[in-house]
Amino acid sequence: MSPECARAAGDAPLRSLEQANRTRFPFFSDVKGDHRLVLAAVETTVLVLIFAVSLLGNVCALVLVARRRRRGATACLVLNLFCADLLFISAIPLVLAVRWTEAWLLGPVACHLLFYVMTLSGSVTILTLAAVSLERMVCIVHLQRGVRGPGRRARAVLLALIWGYSAVAALPLCVFFRVVPQRLPGADQEISICTLIWPTIPGEISWDVSFVTLNFLVPGLVIVISYSKILQITKASRKRLTVSLAYSESHQIRVSQQDFRLFRTLFLLMVSFFIMWSPIIITILLILIQNFKQDLVIWPSLFFWVVAFTFANSALNPILYNMTLCRNEWKKIFCCFWFPEKGAILTDTSVKRNDLSIISG
């Protein structure tokens, strides 16, 4: 055997041993020390508040949109957005359990599913926002405001593609997250943690780069281009309007204003998503860099608060939507509850506005 082959054969076990003994990022597992109860109580208060607001807001938004008699493609996509938010916050109870127990005691199945569900719902959210922006741009460019949108079968196919692609794209996280023993700083002995163990570092790099590109940057670019085109068309149409318009033209102004309100709301949802999801994307990339620079320190507590900030996006989405587009519906609900007579008047007068629904297809 040549010296080179012997050296390579001797280095292989060393590399395997080094990979096995490498300290892995513990994600939500953390040894808090003397202030464990106080820190866990603060974390619980924050996440419970986010969970309650998000659950109430998304359920109310789902009900309000589902009650509309005319539900086009945009309405179906908005409903899909709220469903993705509800799926995302379903991970909060598991996160809180780990923050209290410090070690991972939930078993391997929960370890495989936790980050898979979180990544799946995030991917569905950004792809849904991109689909909404494209649908709105196509309708406005081709002047299809009053034309019937895609049928139920086309909407079902679109939603199936969004969920199917997101499920496949996030599948490696379901496979490679596993429970392993590791000694954390401040711990007297090894504890179980749920961590990501890729077979090879090049595989991890390729997946991270491709996922961020295809599921974050490309949909973001689609959204920016679509809304830029919509804004350009909106500004051009407003310049062509004059004060001395006929009744039919003033009717078109009202529709245009409602389209602009929808555009503004969806644009705010897109901006809030990128602001509140960018920190977790950056943190995941830093965890990848940690494989090459062991001196790069990322605290599990920092990761938790970054994830909590991302969870807050699920609470913000229905708030932005309800405040911007559903003020009249909420006013009608409150009036029906506190002032039945006034609520009945609002209900009767609102029937005539249903044909000008802000969620169109």
From Swiss-Prot:
TM ranges: 46-66, 78-98, 113-133, 157-177, 205-225, 269-289, 296-316
Residue positions, PTM Phosphoserine: S350, S357, S360
Disulfide bonds: C111-C194
Residues exposed to the Cytoplasmic side: 67-77, 134-156, 226-268, 317-361
GO molecular function: arrestin family protein binding; fatty acid binding; G protein-coupled receptor activity; taste receptor activity
Distribution of this protein across tissues and organs: Abundant expression in the intestinal tract. Expressed in colonic intraepithelial neuroendocrine cells.
GO BP, sorted A to Z: adenylate cyclase-activating G protein-coupled receptor signaling pathway; brown fat cell differentiation; G protein-coupled receptor signaling pathway; ghrelin secretion; hormone secretion; inflammatory response; negative regulation of apoptotic process; negative regulation of cytokine production
Keyword Cell membrane recorded: yes
Annotated family: Belongs to the G-protein coupled receptor 1 family.
Protein name, per record: Free fatty acid receptor 4
Gene behind this protein: FFAR4
